[in-house]
Amino acid sequence: MKETRAEKRKKDKSDRATVDKVLDKRTLKVLERLQARGKLVNLQGSLCTGKESNVYLGEASTSLCSKFIKNRYSVTEEPGREGQIVPVVVKIFKTSIMSFRDRERYIRSEKRFQRFCTSNSRKLIKVWAEKEVRNLKRLNNAGIPSPEPIYLKNNILVMTQIGRCSEVAPRLRDASIKDLEGCYQQCVKIIRDMYKKAGLVHADLSEFNLLYFEGVVYVIDVGQSVEIDHDNAQRFLIMDINNINSFFSRKGVSVAKGNDLFEEISGNVIPLYLKDIDIGRDAFIPSRVSEVGNEEDLLAFAADSRSREFGSTTDSDLSSTGEASVEDSDASLGATESRGGGNIREEKKRKKKTVKELNRIRRASRISKKEKKRIFKRYIGMKKRKN
């Protein structure tokens, strides 16, 4: 029986009540419809609980599909299995209790998500779920071991299960690994392929977000993954590398140096004066002269740029030809700054003075709100008289 208009307007606190922090009234209604249609069966209890979602085991029909994913019958490629039941994982994102409160910083600066609502948690979660599906499809297309998305509706995501019906793939943290060195190389390859093939940085890669099954490492939880041109992509990449190195070094594996992995994967070159320092996630690596703040760092950056182009430069060469190095590096990088730090400061002062002058002229010619209203009323009156 359909609800009347008056009943639809009634809202109660119980409508927002949740079970397991994710199963509210709307979510339960979607699950009940899927079960009534025979698309989702044998939904079991919570497999694990994370900061952003709960994961449940179940079984789904191979005919299950959604408009957003558009992959009907792609769960299995074997002919004659259309409409059969396969094991799946149901990931339900939390809506009422936002234990993962900094989702916005992973979505902002993403060209794929220019407009999103931050005041409505349900709309934000919907964007987050869509982001995870898009990232998973990128990984699937790049051949990176990961689950395949099957169905998406609001905050409910159905994916293929990693493992067998009776055996779910354990997290890397809980797995018994015989070949630790090979497993480490697989993890490094995942970071490299995500960056170079899929154009993504995981941003939360650790032993908790990797599964290990039959000697293969699978990557999961890519909702927070960002594109490589994201403002924080470099920071997240360093964090992922350090997390993997830290885990395997505790296991006794001889890991590669974080700086070397960062240079190999990202293609960025760490300056010579930072080579002996293990970069952290908050490290800033300048790529042009305009990003260098003071004169001392400018000379070091110039010497580093010169040595990369013409070979190594000694300290004596730097002291004798410091100003020339600055000038040469500026010319090679196409920078607008002139020789030395003093001229740079003068240039900044001149630009600041120009901006102040332009703002003063703009304020002088600004029309007040009262004058705008008077002009608008006169325009409306003239329009009415013409009609």
Swiss-Prot record:
> What SMART domains does the annotation carry?
RIO
Coiled coil: present as a keyword of the record?
A: no
Q: Where does ATP bind?
A: 91
Q: Which UniProt keywords apply?
A: ATP-binding, Cytoplasm, Hydrolase, Kinase, Magnesium, Metal-binding, Nucleotide-binding, Ribosome biogenesis, Serine/threonine-protein kinase, Transferase
Kindly list the cofactors needed: Mg(2+)
Q: Does the keyword Cytoplasm apply?
A: yes
Q: Which PROSITE patterns match?
A: RIO1
InterPro entries recorded: Kinase-like_dom_sf (IPR011009), RIO-type_Ser/Thr_kinase (IPR051272), RIO_dom (IPR018934), RIO_kinase (IPR000687), RIO_kinase_CS (IPR018935)
- Report the residue ranges that make up the Protein kinase domain in this protein: 41-387
Q: Which reaction does it catalyse?
A: L-seryl-[protein] + ATP = O-phospho-L-seryl-[protein] + ADP + H(+); L-threonyl-[protein] + ATP = O-phospho-L-threonyl-[protein] + ADP + H(+); ATP + H2O = ADP + phosphate + H(+)
Where does the record place Basic residues bias?
A: 361-372
Q: Where is this region: Disordered?
A: 309-372
**Compositional bias (Low complexity) at which positions?**
312-321
| GO MF, any single term | protein serine/threonine kinase activity
- Mention one GO biological process in which this protein takes part, according to its record: ribosome biogenesis
The record's listing under SUPFAM superfamilies reads:
Protein kinase-like (PK-like)
Which residues of this protein are catalytic?
Answer: 204, 221
Q: Which domain of life is it from?
A: Eukaryota
User: Per UniProt, where does Mg(2+) bind?
Assistant: 209, 221
For this chain, the family text in UniProt reads: Belongs to the protein kinase superfamily. RIO-type Ser/Thr kinase family.
Quote the function comment for this protein.
Required for the final endonucleolytic cleavage at site D converting 20S pre-rRNA into the mature 18S rRNA. Required for the final steps of cytoplasmic maturation of the 40S ribosomal subunit. Despite the protein kinase domain is proposed to act predominantly as an ATPase. Has a role in the cell cycle where it is required for entrance into S-phase and in the control of the onset of anaphase. Appears to also be involved in the maintenance of chromosome stability and correct mitotic segregation.
**Official protein name in the record:** Probable serine/threonine-protein kinase RIO1 homolog
Native source species: Encephalitozoon cuniculi (strain GB-M1) (Microsporidian parasite)
What is the primary gene name for this protein?
A: RIO1
